[in-house]
Amino acid sequence: MSTARTENPVIMGLSSQNGQLRGPVKASAGPGGGGTQPQPQLNQLKNTSTINNGTPQQAQSMAATIKPGDDWKKTLKLPPKDLRIKTSDVTSTKGNEFEDYCLKRELLMGIFEMGWEKPSPIQEESIPIALSGRDILARAKNGTGKSGAYLIPLLERLDLKKDNIQAMVIVPTRELALQVSQICIQVSKHMGGAKVMATTGGTNLRDDIMRLDDTVHVVIATPGRILDLIKKGVAKVDHVQMIVLDEADKLLSQDFVQIMEDIILTLPKNRQILLYSATFPLSVQKFMNSHLQKPYEINLMEELTLKGVTQYYAYVTERQKVHCLNTLFSRLQINQSIIFCNSSQRVELLAKKISQLGYSCFYIHAKMRQEHRNRVFHDFRNGLCRNLVCTDLFTRGIDIQAVNVVINFDFPKLAETYLHRIGRSGRFGHLGLAINLITYDDRFNLKSIEEQLGTEIKPIPSNIDKSLYVAEYHSEPAEDEKP
């Protein structure tokens, strides 16, 4: 079975068994960094890309068309309004507006055209502090607008008259680098001359070297690749004023911590560091004490799990798992689902089984070629398939708002892994389901994770209320439909 789509992909809908429709999946735009993100086009799928958002002359021309006193918002191309009800994870705000932060109008235009209407709680806390130049240590849930929280001040502080790298965003996975770069490109599209480059392992190093020979203002990278470019003298970072560590707990784990230490040592001493993470292990605290100067600490996590995600478990034997999954597919109204396995081999075997059952399915794991991973990520994000089977490669920051069901086919060993997995549904305050298939060997781990996260994972009922996870059952009426 091939998971990549070539030409004219034919998608097998899940028929009337579970009420799902054939054809591409659509997700509404959402405000505040958690909205439906612009999809990467095929010519942008190379994991290393430099994007020039117009020229200064084009920006001036655009600005000239908006005369002082005009209602410039009327010129915006806004996405459809997201009418889905949201949880307090994103609605419990102070009532601030993006205009309150005195941002450039060109940046505001990009923000509103993303469908971001008002700042989310993490954005209200982060944006003004980041604009002041102070270091930040922020703890916030997955899917609450963290990308917007750091990209907005990062773009506001760029000096486009200079032709050097001024900001870096470091992320742990190639897919997350692609996603963040696409958001950055879209938000900055009205800022004439802003150049954003994504660079990750698994792509041609020569391409990176050629792109860095031209002007680049923002680099979004995985740790190993950017350190390699710095050591080669290709990526000149002596003018970097801001570095962001997204998913900092992963970046400062044993896999990456020495690389991150080496990167920080190459930066100017007066650089600003922004750390964002859902969990703060000892490694993050140690890094903070060594490198952050009187950081402003943000903690928006009274509880760890997203309020919109309802969690269930089903006791099964290993042999019953595929049958149980088939039952879930037939009974649930799935918009898109992500199914997690604990190894690459099990991912491929399960994807084959799902395909044999007659359901559309892609798979993705770290052992696949990068261009193949890019294609799968792009196609699933664009709604060309309902179900994605994957390893924990897909747990970090990936924001696909159409996903309303996450299934742990294999239960994870760590509470942190569980937290990031179920955070793929219920993005930006919306509702979703997390269903765990639990074997006899998993029972103690289930209890341990419940206790560590302070959450409740309930036995799965025979019928699951659609209002817990289906958008049509929990949407607000449109303005013109309200009484």
UniProtKB/Swiss-Prot annotation:
InterPro entries recorded: DEAD/DEAH_box_helicase_dom, Helicase_ATP-bd, Helicase_C-like, P-loop_NTPase, RNA-helicase_DEAD-box_CS, RNA_helicase_DEAD_Q_motif
UniProt main location, coarse: cytoplasm
Keyword Metal-binding: no
EC class of the enzyme, as a word: hydrolase
Segments forming domain Helicase ATP-binding: 127-298
Residue numbers spanned by region Disordered: 1-57
Chain positions of motif DEAD box: 246-249
Domain Helicase C-terminal intervals: 308-468
Binding site for ATP: 140-147
One record GO biological process: negative regulation of neuron differentiation
UniProt-annotated location(s): Cytoplasm, P-body; Cytoplasm; Nucleus; Cytoplasm, Cytoplasmic ribonucleoprotein granule
Catalytic activity as recorded in UniProt: ATP + H2O = ADP + phosphate + H(+)
Motif Q motif in this chain: 96-124
Phosphothreonine, modified sites: 36
Gene Ontology molecular function, alphabetical: ATP binding; ATP hydrolysis activity; protein domain specific binding; RNA binding; RNA helicase activity
EC number assigned by the record: 3.6.4.13
Assigned keywords, A-Z: ATP-binding, Cytoplasm, Helicase, Hydrolase, Nucleotide-binding, Nucleus, Phosphoprotein, RNA-binding, Ubl conjugation
Role this protein plays: Essential for the formation of P-bodies, cytosolic membrane-less ribonucleoprotein granules involved in RNA metabolism through the coordinated storage of mRNAs encoding regulatory functions. Plays a role in P-bodies to coordinate the storage of translationally inactive mRNAs in the cytoplasm and prevent their degradation. In the process of mRNA degradation, plays a role in mRNA decapping. Blocks autophagy in nutrient-rich conditions by repressing the expression of ATG-related genes through degradation of their transcripts.
Assembly and interaction partners: Interacts with LSM14A, LSM14B, EIF4ENIF1/4E-T, PATL1, EDC3 and EDC4. Forms a complex with DCP1A, DCP2, EDC3 and EDC4/HEDLS. Interacts with LIMD1, WTIP and AJUBA. Interacts with APOBEC3G in an RNA-dependent manner. Interacts with RC3H1. Interacts with ATXN2L. Interacts with MCRIP1. Interacts with MCRIP2. Interacts with NUFIP2. Interacts with TRIM71 (via NHL repeats) in an RNA-dependent manner. Interacts with GIGYF1 and GIGYF2.
Family the entry assigns: Belongs to the DEAD box helicase family. DDX6/DHH1 subfamily.
Protein name per Swiss-Prot or TrEMBL: Probable ATP-dependent RNA helicase DDX6
Organism ancestry: Eukaryota, Metazoa, Chordata, Craniata, Vertebrata
Gene field: Ddx6
